[in-house]
């Protein structure tokens, strides 16, 4: 009944379509592929002939026949086709296996192909092409012959093609392509073509895309009748997924037992599909068949394609990648910073390196001095069992960057490093490490995405691995198996995933299985978290402390106090469960309760540390107590879980076993990694390449580091022998001693921390003090000590108590508020702000963390950044800064420029260095004084008057020589200018010039107080009184102050200062007397203020210089000056010397130059001007006061002060001279010094007579006495 389809194309088409339809009916497929199929196949002759008969004897055409439901064109043909495909018995299938058909496969252009035969072939043998006209009976042999003839025809004329026959090799190749590419016919065909090409087979034998598609559907239809689609496995799957999974499982079964399908094999096929593994008895052997975790199935499990890329093909990565390490928290930052290392680390690493090698490197790089000392001690004395754990109490962990997304990886077989690339090879078949056992553990259905929650197949199937959270979470033994097997390989990936953290498999190197707690914690962690953690409170924490905390563990390398307390506690409560103490909040105050809060924290900390949760306590022992407690509070769930897990790790492990896989989605894995990171153990088998892939091949690897207490790694029996505790205590004490920890400090911290409520204290006082302590504990380090010394200098006296409390030479890096003063009122921020820089830092002069200092900062620097002043690299030391009273920011007005002084603008001094300037306070004084002051306190009135006179004259000379004095007359501010100023208290940081009475006459009694030696800072009087000074800049030109009304001085002379005077006023020369030994004509005796000899600074020098015409047109000297009138005497004492009027010319003030000046903006320039009114207010400080806390150095040459020495007390002058000289030495450039020297020489050479004449000519005053006397 074979119907010969004529060669006529239409007949063939009809048959083809019919065949397709029949296939469609048979198949559940419903795919329309058949239509296309038919179209292509239409070119080939179909043999319906065989069909009817085949119905009788041929194997049923496998539903897999690609025919799609195309409408039947010839009803008889359609019917025949249907009969053929549906009726042909399976028994005949094998007969199609003959390889002979292979040749005919593609070649046969004319020979119609029996679909039934092909279908059968799909199951076992090749399909032989059947001659188009061949009767069914002879179809087989004739088909072969025809096949070959068809091949010839095909080559000669490609009009017809014979139905291809599929040899076993072809089928094997097809299934390989199917495993790899899934339902991608073109990719499968390319795979086959490539294989044939390699083997040198003719292109005619290569199956084309349509043939591949047909074979796919024929095979599928063949097996659909055996698949139980009602099973839960198939319910949630799309039809394409069912096909793919069914065909892949069938292909696996076919490999082992052949493609013959009978009831028995059908059952096994269903089992394989639904469970993922089955056992088949074949030829006397039991064969274990597992669903392959091939790429195609992974795509099903991981529709997002997370694992797609990495699976089969080796991934080529760059050889090296930049890596950036940042501290995970303040504790980590402080630890590295305290070592004078940069907490941010960038380096280029080779991807084939293990993460553990990176950790080891960092561990050595950032090893604490204390650790080295400890090692030495342990080598010598602590050889016993305890010593080893002690060393590892706090371990370095790396964590993925905060913003990176983590993707679990499939099992990595190996990472190969070559010259060009770093290549990551996946485990065979792209199988996840755990897949082997996991696959069975989880039914394929789940793998396929029924449990899509799991994430990538590897993540899912390999849950244990990626889900290491479940981490071996006690998977059932089989799972455990899988874990182990995968664990062996997976440790790498596991750690890589980090989710596994090696925890995934108890075997994982990270934690020896023996330590249930270690693994348990992880294992349990998931379950425990699910169960316990959420419900538990820290108080309720199971006693993780069952293992008494390791003191070492707790001992924060950084904070001596907690360590000390902990050690004491250890002694006190050696066998008690600390957790209990902590929970109740009742701690046994090791130090008489003072430390109780801290102790608590440590305890909880310990618990946390001990708890496998190490990560949650991450702050770990090393962290400040507050951090610990905070962690406890924050991560109570985790810690609790973990702690709880340790409590019952084994049980948890067992229980979670089944569910962990499901519980561990990729997100969970990522979270786990973020919580636990990688340490030396967990990352031993993890390469940076895996981390790189997990993070999605970023341009640079961003990792964070922290030190976590591996207490969890040390699950110790609940009660350790008391002897052990004692030993530990002793070792702790040794360590403390070795690290030079100051117990007093600890006590202070204790009391402080105790004072505050535990939570509050943790946040505020505890953290700061703890951190401070931590930092200070590093004292042994030399550089640190230096830093501390610097900081100590920096500490204001108020901070002194603090510093004394922190006796350790090293200063705390963090200024959490004065630790001793009471950190409670400090910001209380959780994170201390680093104040002290590493020893080599050029900011070594940072402001020291004294409470008072902070207050003053805040008060004074409200609107101004305090750092402008403090962080500038300045030589001067702000030792006495704390003395400074709150500074008032003064408004500075621009003086009205007077017409004649266009170029004198240079007379502003930029006080960038001055402490005041940063704050925006107006200060006409040379900041140089501050330096001097910092360098050494100025002793008021100590200098001999003659020195003062020296200074004055020297200053004048210097000013003139330096060109500071402008030729243009700058009217000296009238004494009136000083009148408004009330004397500043000695405390005030800025010395004020003693104010003159409003009348503007200087009274001898009013001599300006000298700057208090104690406060070297030169700054503007902080008092608001000064504020007006700026206002005074009434129309005076920038360079020259408006001519002040000449107020009668005591002597009755009005003192219009000559420009030279005014300029000198502006000058703030440092102690010139010290710099230069210049002998100038001595001042007239009457000029000496208050009878002190040579007090008056001869302005004559300046005037001489001016008269010489060096500095512009000569200005008539003020009569007071010439006469040696009181005005000259009224020179304000050095403290007053910084008379507001005086403005240093930029040339004179080194700060004027950008190099030293903080701010060269106009505002700063203007700030340097002082209006006469302000000057008045600024000047008056009682003579006697040493308070001239900060010299207004510039005012040494203050116009009034210089001209009228009278009002200035010699002591003041001496102080000023000294301070100013020091400033000049410190701040002024060498050029200036050399200028002064030159000036001195000139003066010495110059005719004294001429100078005197000048003086006389100007005012007829007595010649200035030689200052050098």
Swiss-Prot record:
Biased composition (Polar residues): 757-767, 774-806, 982-1002
Bias (Low complexity): 124-147, 485-507, 1055-1070, 1125-1140
GO cellular component: nucleus
Example of a GO biological process term: pattern specification process
Signal peptide: none
Biased composition (Basic and acidic residues): 13-24, 43-52, 151-165, 508-518, 526-535
UniProt keywords, alphabetically: DNA-binding, Nucleus, Phosphoprotein
Location, primary (coarse class): nucleus
Record-linked PROSITE patterns: SANT
Superkingdom assignment: Eukaryota
Gly residues bias spans: 1-12, 105-123
Disulfide bonds: none
The keyword Nucleotide-binding is assigned to this record: no
Modified residues (Phosphoserine): 307, 1268
Biased composition regions of type Pro residues, renumbered to the chain: 59-74
GO molecular function: chromatin binding; DNA binding
Region (Disordered): 1-165, 450-541, 581-666, 757-827, 976-1034, 1055-1092, 1115-1157
Compartmental location: Nucleus
Annotated ranges, domain SANT: 161-224
Similarity remark: Belongs to the cramped family.
The protein's name in its UniProt record: Protein cramped-like
Organism: Homo sapiens (Human)
